Amino acid sequence: MSHAARRASELALDETTVTALRAALKTTADEVVQAIIDEVPSYANALSGRMGGTIRRAVRTALGHYLDLASGNATGGDGDDAAYELGRGEVRDGRSMDALLSAYRVGARVAWRCLAAGAVPAGLPAAEVAKFAELTFAYIDELSAASAAGHADELAARGRAHERHLEHLARELLAGASPDVLLASGQRAGWQPPVSLTAVLLPAAQARPVYRALDPSTLVLDDLPDATGVLLVPDADRSHLLRQLTDRAAVVGPARPWTRASASYARAVRARALSSDVRDTEDHLPELVLSADADAFADLRARALAPLRTLPVATARRLEETLREWLLHQGRRDEVAAALFVHPQTVRYRMTQLRELFPDLASPHRVLELTLAVGLRGS
């Protein structure tokens, strides 16, 4: 039994007073409900019809239980449980905690006015009336607190469920689930699909702090392998997003239609594997293309650069670097020399060696093959 209920049982109202108060319970419940309708906007249209009847019965039951306590005739049961469930139900009906507490305040005032109107004519002494008032408000306060707890618990449970649905959707997006599956998951999570999603990889510890600064519809996971987090940012302004990620160890994938977010994620993962310095995958497309099939790239290099294998390792490395700069600078000797930090004559000498090793160096096919083969620095 609650503290207020124990104190109420100490009142020991006489049978005459209790009978008078019970006779007014229906009228009291009607007036309480009407006052709530009139004074609390959230309930203006909620307490009519069958719902209104349910609430009136609940008010009569709660006050009747209180009168049982006050007369010393309580037979068990606890109004707190019903009040707790009422609070949970208010969340399901879409009403706020403020609306619920306002309804209790209005209800307490009107209920006491009606109870006092019955107690005083029944001959309850003034001192007992004062105590009755105090305990009535204390009892209703406890019911209010129980409803508030139910409301808060239901909100928390719904919040956790909502978060689980969003996390499930994010995992399905990363896994490349079918559009039908993704649409169903999005609806279950109450998530409005955008046109595009951009994947952002970053350390798990940074995922939530960054997430809080982004579009509220951003999806976040912070429990991926290797202490990695991922954000799926809807319809991102790329330049703005990159500025927001300044000083973060983030890798930003390309924007992709939202059902293909897995492609953005996969590219970000591959880009991060290339180098820890990668930030914007759009700045590293050549490297990503050349590294897409590692075996094919290794075979291409082995075939295209086979003539260099006859040379000492250091010599082969210098000539490969010279060949790379020569291809990239389209044979402009001074630019090649500047890129290599050598004299132009050194470039001339090395190119003579390369032409001897690659007699068909001017062939378009050979130029294409060699450009691809030396395209990744340090391969």
Description of each model-found segment:
Residues P179-A199, Q206-S379:
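Cytosolic nucleotide-utilizing catalytic cores of signal-transduction proteins
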Residues R164-H168, S178, G190:
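Canonical alpha-helical transmembrane segment with a positive-inside/aromatic-interface signature
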Residues M1-E167, T218, T322-S379:
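Alpha-helical/coil-rich non-catalytic "connector" segments in signaling and regulatory proteins
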Residues S102, L174, A294-D295:
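Short capping/connector residues at structural and topological boundaries
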Residues L169-L173:
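Regulatory cytosolic signal-relay segments
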Residues A161, L174, Q192:
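Short, contiguous, pocket-lining structural segments
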